[in-house]
């Protein structure tokens, strides 16, 4: 996120006047887009800055950097604020009061680290004394069941699985029934990585959702994929519906634009970010920390 921080820092320290604001915002817009901020998000951010400065005599401000910093902080806070906030642990506890498991369905394209992320979530739940079972509903990709089983065995979580090419929805259904019978708190449903253009796999995904009736649908995206991650999230949201995001490889993302764009354009919260390969390398996404990282500005 250092690159995005430098972009905002340079903007704040510019010798802005009412006459030069437009060109400065155009330059900011291009720099944002160059750092994985989607065009629509960059346009909205710059327009909000312009609106916030309307009527201000910028050149006469005695503390211009501080003033612009506060404007940016408020605007980015607004961009990152979702339509619905999710307290995962609390939602699980509420659902469990009715003696029913809380069901989480994970989706995304291949190569984003989805299966490893499921293991990280299982480990996170285990640390919070919440039991879980995994459904190996990726019956499409070779070695997918073995990969999930390997990770879950490492952390002591059972996997419900069928044969390859079997109905993925039936695997999810069996996992839910197992959780009910064994009084397990959470069902974690793995699904085949798919492109939204693959209509057969998308119909399969819709069936999994219809049969398992998840309480939470999580899109797992690669933060290094930039606008591709945003486009994938939007397409999955249109086809299936998603409730929140997990961004992987967040520790390696020098730009930080994907988080801004996904938050703004889907209006869905980022619940967690992956920060390494270990099962414990998962952190709840904190808006305030993210903002402080990309607005690491010091007044001149």
Task: Please describe what each predicted stretch is.
Residues 141, 154, 191-194, 210, ...:
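Short, cationic motifs built from Arg/Lys/His that form the positively charged side of catalytic pockets
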Residues 4-137, 144-164, 173-179, 186-189:
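Primarily NTPase-proximal linker/entry elements flanking Walker-type ATP/GTP-binding cores
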Residues 1-6, 300:
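Short acidic DE-rich linear segments
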Residues 21, 114, 140-141, 168, ...:
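Charged, low-complexity surface patches
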Residues 147, 167-182, 196-299:
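Conserved catalytic-core segment of NTP-binding enzymes
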Residues 110, 192-193, 222:
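Short glycine-/small-residue-rich Rossmann-like dinucleotide-binding loops
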Residues 39-41, 141, 251, 279:
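Short hydrophobic/aromatic residue motifs in ordered secondary structure
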Residues 190, 299-300:
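Short hydrophobic/aromatic patches at helix-to-coil boundaries
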